Amino acid sequence: MSVAGIILRPWYRFASKVFATWARPTVQPEIPAELLAGNDAPVCYVLEHGGLADTLALERQCQIHGLPSPLADLQFAGIAESGQNVVLRRKRGFILRRPSTKGSKRLERLVDASIAAGGKELLLIPVAIYWGRSPDKQHAWFKLLFTENWDVAGRTRKFFATIFQGRNTLLRFSDPLPLSSIVQDGLKPEVAYRKVSRILRVHFRQRRIATVGPDLSHRRTLVNVVMHDPGVRAAIDAEAGDSRTKLERTTQKARKYAQEIAAHISYPTVRVVERFLGWVWNRIYDGIEMSHVDRLHEIARDHEIVYAPCHRSHFDYLLLSYIVYHQGLSLPHVAAGINLNMPFIGAILRRGGAFYLRRSFKGNRLYAAVFSAYLRQILVRGHSIEYFVEGGRSRTGRLLAPKGGMLAMTVGSYISEPRLPVVFVPVYFGYEKLIEGDSFISELGGAQKQKESLFGLIRSVKSLRENFGKVYVNIGEPIPLEPLLDAANPEWRTSASYEQERPPWVGDVIDELGDAIMGGINAAAAVTPISLLAYALLATPKQSMGELELHRQLALSVKLLSRFRYSESVTLPDMSPRDIVDHGEKLQVIKRTAHPLGDVVSMSEHEAVLMTYFRNNVQHLFAIPASIACCFIQGRRLEHSELQRLIRLIYPFMQAELRLKWDFDDIDDVTTDAIEALLEQKILTRQGKFLVRPSAGSAPAFQLLMMGQSMVPMLQRFYLAIALLVTNGSGILTRAKLESLCMNSAQRLAMIYGLHSPDFFDKALFHDFIRTLRARNVVRRNDAGFLEFDDDIQRIGEDARLVLGEEIRHSILSLTFSGPGFDRL
């Protein structure tokens, strides 16, 4: 060890502890020592720019996490270095600091030694340190002071950055790069050194883009770029015609559109909002549980990310951006409905990354051109994007049909200018209570949707006094765009310009992509304690159950979902049935009533209505085993093949409503797997070729009955639509008339039988069912617009006898007028 090292090393270590009193960076990964698990090769840290602050921060975190010190001597391949760190880019000059054109001499010596020693192993660990996180602004007159951007900070600026941004700093350890795998046999030392340096430079650039985002254009500059887009100019010319006066007015209109749309990210605003949101989350939620976040880190460095979450609450916008920012990734640009562009609030959201879009572009070619050009610029510059493929918030807890508008513009922008590969990331939000719950129920009951306003937001502040449980955020499996394009048209990179006319095959890609995103969201579902309680209690007539029976039903649900696993991305609660009940009681969604023979757990009528939302969140996970259980409500035994036939019959309609992932051709095998899962739980038994329900009155029989009841409302809706078709006759009803009849009949049925589920008469569900009937060619639309069908449709009604009780079937039929075929249903 050198004399300087003996003197300076203790000072460095002391200084790092003092420095840590105000500089406390967020470290990623949370346990960096795992990067070196099972590897005892010597380590050398690589810093991009270096400096005293970076060295002290790295030294302190290495002490905390038990990693080799960057200040320790490095003995490698016969050479000795006075530190286990390399600075890739230094500045020269004492007063006027300029980037040095020379590389790292230490790195050069290490590469030479590795080659001389026949490729001896050394682990290079890139360490990126960002003092404050905001990207640079292209062509801006000044940069945000003391925040991390694309400029190499000078000493004075770095000093103040550590003072003011010490606790808004990210220190990221990347995966080790084995030097031997980079330095191949036969490379000359100078060539090998240049190769290693280039790989590290590219790595740091990609990491910076993933963390702070690409350079931000000033909003005015970006608007000007949009205004010069060929598509926008063509739309202006088409609307203005030959009139010079109209050309000026149309140009101004286009500019106003661009200004209405464009985000204006302000990192000082982001930091203020981040602290405010942290306070809000801590006040109303018991925590935010995240799963599979590692998927984001795997793709962020070299992909353009389009976040595609389900839409359950207005908080979705804020939650995902908050989580992404806290994961050390660049803040996404979020597509927000123009209804959120309220006074004051809209400006804050815009500075947090929101760009606004109108609900419909129909008939406004100019607006569509401006929006498309803006989106293209965001993609081309490498910004991550977030939008809701469903379009609006789900009022029922089920996924809505994907809307193709934003997908079409994203795909079109990428085809026009493919840069970084685009991946779509499905994101699942699982809430335990919703702030908008009551308004959703009112809207499903027929009330008009309330318009967002500042006063409405102020009124909702009272919600901050309530406890909304936990929020679960699951990251789905990323969906790359290029394989879909390659499968649809291998020549898409050299085809005619997308700007001229959208090729027909692109529509198929958009449909496939939308379905894949919805499937990815469902596959990443979070099963929450509240959704399990809702699933169990809503299956009972009075939404109540003995506590012991409820414990058994909850345990069955968890075991069944573990055995019949919808997807490896689905997460289950790590709680006992007793803990789940206690949790529900704490959130006041259930109440426990003491009784000498055993406590009874129940939901109030109001809570039962709200809890249908959370049951629907997870209904797709239970759909197949619950449908099998449903077949045993009216009968005690069925052949295996008959069960498969019944599931085949209803599967296309269940698939459309619940966005189930299995292909129709595979459903027999899926049914068999679900049967085996039920047999393992001993709520079904096998007798030869028959499957048999347990003895009436037994606990397993009760469990099977409760599971089957969860699917009955869906089957009742299907049967109601068929009954209305048959009783009115072929060629009598239009699609719109049938939908209206279905909704009104279901609403009356719910009133008579006290069905606490407003989604039972949701018009959108009947719309999807009728659309599936048409897609399966069960019904057809004639030239006059009326629905026609054959006698085959009556088979569905006849099979309903096996599932639906006689009382409910007659109640449904009593709501319809007698007509041809009435007596056969």
Named regions from a protein language model:
Residues 1-825:
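Membrane-interfacial terminal anchoring regions of lipid-handling membrane enzymes
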